[in-house]
Amino acid sequence: MMTSVIPRGFPPRQYGVPGDRSSSLGCKRGGLARGGGGDVKDDFKRNTGNSARPMYSIVIPVYNEGSRVLSALGSVVGCIRARGWDAEVLVVNDGSTDSTADMVRAFARTAPEVRLLENPGNRGKGFSVRSGMLLARGGVALFTDADLSAPIEEAERLFAAIRQGADIAIGSRWLEKDRQTQRQPLYRQFFGRCFNTVTRFVMRLPFADTQCGFKAFTRQAAQTVFQLQTIERWGFDPEILFIALKRDFWIIEVPVSWAHDERSRLSYLKDGFKMLQEITIVRWNAFRGRYDKPVDAPPRTGEKQ
């Protein structure tokens, strides 16, 4: 019998109660409810004679990433092949106006692991992640940023947490600060910490880092959480964590290596107010019972999607 071992130096924080909660999630059998993936164009040509699913799905939202998307895909596919992962890569194009989509298509012709999804225009990072996670075929789905601030090799730390029984594993930049190989400028650290503190207080989230764009979900957790997600832009991370806790999923927060990318598009000054508005929307949704609705159960492995 094979046992999985969490990597050395792995002091995770755990939230929620482990165990089988399928009977308490309000799931029902049937097709997936329309979520972010409903209107997304999928370049993947399904082979109806082969219903096998990969073990892992890696979702990468992109918007005007022509300067680095090929490098990112090279790193991700190289890691998949070097480690022998049974994985697919879903690149979700959020209405890019540069050559991003064409570059991904060209890369995919030489890398069968890669498939391109196209949003109906520019809808936001939250929409892109939701689309990719709902269309992911893997037993475990992870989303990561195109800048690979968390090296894709760190995904193994999240996968290990899920093999140990977690429903969701989230990367954290703050549990082990010495794992940051390139720190943010002080002003970004300050605003980031302020936003994280406000978010944790308003939404009663216990996590050290809500905003790290490196999170992995079991298929059931992903299909439940992302069907209920409503925030489509930067503030979606706190919402999906709020939903996950509300639906009683077991979450492990895992320290990961991380390097700040100066090309990051998130501006805490410009986007911070909008994100604060979005967390108040989440609280309002919770008050109205938006996150208590039953959701469709995902097809079992081997069923056609």
Predicted regions and their residues:
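Short, well-formed alpha-helical segments that are part of the catalytic scaffolds
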Residues: 65-80
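A conserved acidic beta->alpha catalytic loop
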Residues: 93-101, 148
